[in-house]
């Protein structure tokens, strides 16, 4: 793949905003004219609504959803089914050619259970990129849900930020983590332009970066370190080109680049 792909992770709340989905996919269409794009998604709000309607309790530990094995049929249906197909339909309506997938398809990603206390929650790692590269070669838009599988065939629920990170590692791609926030905010709710490991640790110790945002930032930092390139946390309402041009959002900068840049900016 001669041009570096872009992996875009979208939060599940996007599913409740049809106009935002349209804006995002039109922006994707513009970028896809010159670079391959992959979308990875979660669906937390959809899962929570389904769990509540079924009378099933949904809890989190440190921002990660606890997933009993008996909940997996419903979570799999919500993420790999409803959420994935809603996004595929919106992409199709925007003139794209979506292909709905999950982490386990094509042996792209393999997962292991995180820990007993989390239940069927998976830790993903890269496996084989050949299938995904062949899909991208057809000028399609892979839209990948965060449902994975262990080597023994146990379905596992993977945090969507971590799912996007592993797909970016699989393709050596740039990674954008998009949600309904403009980026990482400081204690005064002002946008932080760039963070590295040291500043993340400082903000976390001050209680500024917590819970789901801490999971997001940690996943972004791990990917930035692995890829030796910045990872971007931004709003799905922003233009993708603007994010890549660093005019909006928060860059998560790997240690090597942070050292080269010294103490510039927020780093």
Swiss-Prot record:
InterPro entries: AceGlu_kinase-like_sf, AcgluKinase_fam, ArgB, Asp/Glu/Uridylate_kinase. Its main location: cytoplasm. The keyword ATP-binding applies. GO terms for cellular component: cytoplasm. GO terms for biological process: arginine biosynthetic process via ornithine; L-arginine biosynthetic process. Disulfide bonds: none annotated. It comes from the Bacteria. It is found in: Cytoplasm. Pfam families: AA_kinase. GO terms for molecular function: acetylglutamate kinase activity; ATP binding. The keyword Transcription regulation does not apply. The record marks 9, 216 as: Transition state stabilizer. Substrate binds at residues 43-44, 65, 157. Its EC number is 2.7.2.8. Keywords: Amino-acid biosynthesis, Arginine biosynthesis, ATP-binding, Cytoplasm, Kinase, Nucleotide-binding, Transferase. It catalyses: N-acetyl-L-glutamate + ATP = N-acetyl-L-glutamyl 5-phosphate + ADP. Pathway: Amino-acid biosynthesis; L-arginine biosynthesis; N(2)-acetyl-L-ornithine from L-glutamate: step 2/4. Belongs to the acetylglutamate kinase family. ArgB subfamily. Catalyzes the ATP-dependent phosphorylation of N-acetyl-L-glutamate. This is Acetylglutamate kinase.
